[in-house]
């Protein structure tokens, strides 16, 4: 994470501009006086630098606030270098080298955001793999079917970086990578947008079955996003997981599925190679979709009504069925005219962390609006109620 540590620094006069960067204000934490935020704007993007006075070490650590992450990371490093220079920081250590920033200014075209597919997905267009790991199966399918477009979903950063490197080295152009929870991602896709959906060797969670990706809610979203003739393919070495998934399918009112055991797939993963050597059984469960699904009504309004009082916010947390909302930290600008509220909300599996920016009677989400999932919208309405 880009940062520097300083023995001392002095806030410059705000606002100030340098090399296209606007440092517009600093804000103090209302409950923790040893923490501050600095608001930065550049190229239509905005983010916070966070300053923490570490009393035990008798120094200051200045980094970007990861809740306001922007890409590429070179933008953040340059902002920190400018701030260090303008604040006359006495730097003790840093990881802000120019060489790294130049290399990190380049964005890979293969890494996409979930929002991208809300507008780009079309019926029967995508083959999707959830949890692609080393990418062996995903890349094999992409090379075998160059006419298809693939989405690989993964939350393990080293796996993502490895596959991104291979996509560039092997010049594979029909794959997009998304670092996001698959259960929430499917909710964002248009109906009938997937032709094949692969879930190969998911973590079985034998002692915590509630953490499995297969659930009634997941199956409902899978069926909705599969086009007519689309297939959901589960491949697992866990008999318990296989039986669990089969029972979920049988609970559906109408379903067509098939089963295979120890079927030789065109390509095997490193996990499958390991299980084969141990003479373990491999189970395939294939759900065949034969129904067209209408597009759901997706929440789109994440605006706030005019506020009566800027100081109405307070720390609080509320848990509802399937979602939650919380206000975690409160910050106020030096002139008292603006506030930043750090909030966490939405689905328990993949919560959003967002700042609310309040100036006068106006409130908005800092940086960008939340992902338009149902859980996020329900939480948004509760946040709006708290601030009214």
From Swiss-Prot:
Got a GO cellular component term for this one? tRNA methyltransferase complex
Q: What is this protein called?
A: tRNA (guanine-N(7)-)-methyltransferase
Q: Which residues form a coiled coil?
A: none
User: Where on this chain does S-adenosyl-L-methionine bind?
Assistant: 129, 154, 181
Which residues of the sequence carry a binding annotation for substrate?
207, 237
Task: Supply the EC number(s).
Answer: 2.1.1.33
Q: What class of enzyme is it?
A: transferase
> What's this chain's function?
Catalyzes the formation of N(7)-methylguanine at position 46 (m7G46) in tRNA.
> Do you know which Gene3D superfamilies this protein is assigned to?
Vaccinia Virus protein VP39
Similarity field:
Belongs to the class I-like SAM-binding methyltransferase superfamily. TrmB family.
Provide the gene name from the record: trmB
A Pfam family that the UniProt record links to this protein: Methyltransf_4
Q: Which CDD domains match?
A: AdoMet_MTases (cd02440)
Keyword list (alphabetical) reads: Methyltransferase, S-adenosyl-L-methionine, Transferase, tRNA processing
The metabolic or biological pathway listed in the UniProt record of this protein is: tRNA modification; N(7)-methylguanine-tRNA biosynthesis
- Catalysed reaction equations from the record: guanosine(46) in tRNA + S-adenosyl-L-methionine = N(7)-methylguanosine(46) in tRNA + S-adenosyl-L-homocysteine
- Gene Ontology MF terms in the entry: tRNA (guanine(46)-N7)-methyltransferase activity
Is Glycoprotein among the key words of this record? no
Q: Which domain of life is it from?
A: Bacteria
């Amino acid at each position: 994470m880009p940062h520097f540590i300083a023995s001392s620094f002095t806030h410059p006069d705000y606002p100030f501009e340098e090399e296209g960067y606007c440092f517009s204000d600093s804000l103090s934490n209302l409950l923790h006086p040893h923490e501050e935020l600095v608001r930065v704007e550049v190229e239509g993007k905005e983010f916070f630098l966070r300053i923490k006075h570490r009393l035990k070490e008798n120094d200051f650590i200045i980094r970007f606030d990861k809740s306001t992450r922007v890409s590429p990371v070179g933008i953040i490093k340059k902002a920190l270098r400018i701030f260090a220079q303008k604040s006359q920081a006495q730097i003790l250590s840093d990881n802000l080298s120019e060489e790294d920033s130049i290399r990190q200014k380049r964005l890979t075209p293969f890494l996409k955001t979930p929002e991208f597919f809300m507008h780009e997905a079309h019926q029967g267009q995508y083959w999707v793999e959830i949890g692609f790991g080393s990418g062996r199966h995903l890349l094999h399918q992409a090379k075998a079917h160059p006419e298809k477009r693939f989405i690989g979903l993964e939350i393990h950063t080293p796996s993502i970086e490895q596959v991104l490197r291979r996509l560039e080295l092997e010049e594979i152009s029909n794959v997009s990578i998304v670092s996001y929870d698959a259960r929430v991602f499917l909710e964002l896709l248009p109906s009938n947008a997937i032709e094949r959906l692969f879930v190969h060797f998911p973590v079985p969670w034998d002692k915590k079955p509630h953490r499995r990706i297969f659930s009634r809610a997941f199956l409902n979203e899978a069926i909705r996003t599969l086009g007519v003739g689309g297939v959901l393919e589960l491949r697992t070495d866990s008999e318990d997981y296989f039986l669990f998934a089969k029972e979920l399918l049988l609970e559906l009112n109408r379903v067509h599925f098939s089963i295979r055991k120890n079927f030789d797939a065109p390509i095997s993963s490193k996990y499958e190679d390991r299980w084969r050597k141990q003479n373990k059984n491999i189970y395939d469960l294939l759900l065949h979709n034969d129904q067209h699904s209408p597009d759901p009504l997706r929440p789109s309004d994440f605006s706030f009504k005019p506020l009566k009082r800027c100081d109405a916010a307070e720390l609080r947390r509320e848990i509802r069925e399937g979602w939650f909302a919380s206000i975690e930290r409160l910050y106020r600008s030096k002139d008292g005219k603006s506030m930043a509220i750090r909030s966490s909300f939405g689905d328990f599996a993949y919560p959003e962390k967002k700042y609310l920016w309040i100036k006068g009677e106006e409130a908005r989400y800092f940086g960008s609006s939340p992902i338009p999932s149902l859980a996020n919208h329900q939480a948004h309405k509760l946040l709006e109620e708290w601030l009214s």
